[in-house]
Amino acid sequence: MDIEAYFERIGYNNPVYTLDLATLTEVLQHQMRTIPFENLNMHCGEAMDLGLEATFDQIVRKKRGGWCLQVNHLLYWALTQMGFETTMLGGYVYIVPVSKYSSEMIHLLVQVTISDRNYIVDAAYGGSYQMWEPVELASGKDQPQVPAIFRLTEENETWYLDQIRREQHVPNQEFVNSDLLEKNTYRKIYSFTLQPRTIEDFEYANTYLQISPVSVFVNTSFCSLQTSEGVCCLIGSTIARRKFSYKENVDLVEFKNVSEEEIEDVLKTAFGVSLERKFVPKNGNLSFSI
């Protein structure tokens, strides 16, 4: 595995860099705009592999994406290779339909320490929940970013990441009440502790999320990529685009259903993804939102 190949994959062309917040932010933004957050393997009859070598091959060499256990694992490796002080952490995702956090640790995220300050770095939550900048590990501090305001709160050594969102305009009235549309302006995202983790700690989650009938990844196919203006998602056979702040304090959210014949072209043009096997889009009862 070669860090230069990773830099080429994300379009990062700075041969001389400083291990500071500006560099960390730049790497995060390059990765999130070139590497999709996706689970397409599962809907092409393939497994989501946890190993770093397999992840590097899929994302860097084959120019695919992956889910958090792959995409953030790659980011953790790259930042460590660059010389950043990194710690792998595990998160518990907030499940909106049941109004509670997952009982299992199913999200991988990264902590980076710079000049005695700690930051949460996450390139693989996807949709409009994706941070565009590292979030400083400071309890109760509102941290405005392009997608939304992010807020971390610490209670009894557990940290909670929340998001304060803008109003939104949906031109296609067919989707105003759709489950694909995030309707909360205050959104809980996930919780985590600062206990260091290894990739082996996620083996159960990697299996569970691929086989459980209540796993959103089993129920729904998705592909999400951040853009210069917002985010583009393919959820099942619906393409959704959110433009952040298209006017003051309002996001524009557009939806369009695409035919099976259009899917391959959408994946190539919107996400830069070419699949080796036949893809069967799926949007079940458990779905993602934008």
Swiss-Prot record:
It is an enzyme of class 2 (transferase). CoA binds at S103, Y208, S287. Gene3D superfamilies: 3.30.2140.20. GO terms for cellular component: cytoplasm. Coiled coil: none annotated. Its EC number is 2.3.1.5. It comes from the Eukaryota. Keywords: Acetylation, Acyltransferase, Cytoplasm, Transferase. It is found in: Cytoplasm. The active site is at C68, H107, D122. One of its GO terms (molecular function) is arylamine N-acetyltransferase activity. Substrate binds at I106, H107. InterPro entries: Arylamine_N-AcTrfase, Arylamine_NAT_domain_sf, Papain-like_cys_pep_sf. The modification N-acetylmethionine is found at M1. It catalyses: an arylamine + acetyl-CoA = an N-acetylarylamine + CoA. Participates in the detoxification of a plethora of hydrazine and arylamine drugs. Belongs to the arylamine N-acetyltransferase family. This is Arylamine N-acetyltransferase 1. The lineage of its organism: Eukaryota, Metazoa, Chordata, Craniata, Vertebrata. The gene is NAT1.
